[in-house]
Regions:
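Metal-cofactor-dependent catalytic cores
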Residues: 1-211
Length: 211
């Protein structure tokens, strides 16, 4: 990661104004994007030349990869914890857009079996699971209360071919929220060998955001 100090920052929408962003520094200082000096303040905080850019809610510009969303299941995180009990496989290490809460007792890397399939989240959002996600050393870095741990990536590499989670493209946009069910797209249900499995639910993710 070019700027590891960014992991120490937190972001939130300004209270009562979703058009402004607050950046919270490790010492608790709040930098507001509405402040005329914001760009200078964020550069001084990070010690590198950076610029905050605003995109409309529905962006006209597509991400070049076409695989804009990262999804991981709690089953995968629990499976990794079982392989390396001393490690903390907190979702923050892996920076997913969406965390799917797997049914109780379910383990293994469930989302890897969804590659090539179409899934629906909530009433309208539809994603295509494009590929598994190869991990890098950012997963080992210290951030907030998570310590540096090189064995996180070592375990993923040795036990699961250096992949954790999947990358998805958006087939149909929609609003998603914590608690939404994730299930096979209706057009594919009859063709999926595991369509009888109980639906999964979002436990974390792009809460109330359009994808």
């Amino acid at each position: 990661m070019a700027f590891p100090s960014m992991l120490d920052l937190k972001a939130r929408f300004a209270q009562g104004d979703s058009t402004r962003l607050d950046i919270i520094t490790p010492n608790g200082r709040v930098l507001s994007s509405g402040d005329p000096d914001f760009q200078t303040q964020i550069r001084e905080t990070l010690g590198v030349p950076v610029k905050l850019m605003e995109f409309p809610q529905v962006a006209e510009t597509r991400l070049r990869s076409g695989r804009a969303l990262h999804l991981v299941t709690t089953a995968s995180l629990i499976s990794m914890e079982n392989l390396y009990p001393e490690g903390d496989f907190d979702p923050r290490r892996f920076r997913p857009n969406i965390v799917v809460n797997s049914p109780p007792g379910r383990n293994g890397f469930a989302e890897e079996s969804w590659v090539g399939e179409t899934i629906r989240i909530g009433p309208e959002a539809t994603l295509r699971v494009e590929k598994t996600n190869r991990r890098c050393k950012v997963t080992t870095m210290k951030q907030d209360d998570l310590p540096y741990d090189g064995k996180i990536l070592e375990t993923i590499s040795q036990k699961n071919g250096n992949v954790l989670g999947v990358m998805c493209s958006v087939v149909k946009g929609g609003i998603i929220a914590v608690g939404d069910e994730l299930e096979p797209s209706p057009a594919e249900i009859d063709d999926l060998p595991h369509h009888s499995a109980p639906p999964r639910h979002l436990s974390q993710g792009s809460v109330g955001n359009r994808i």
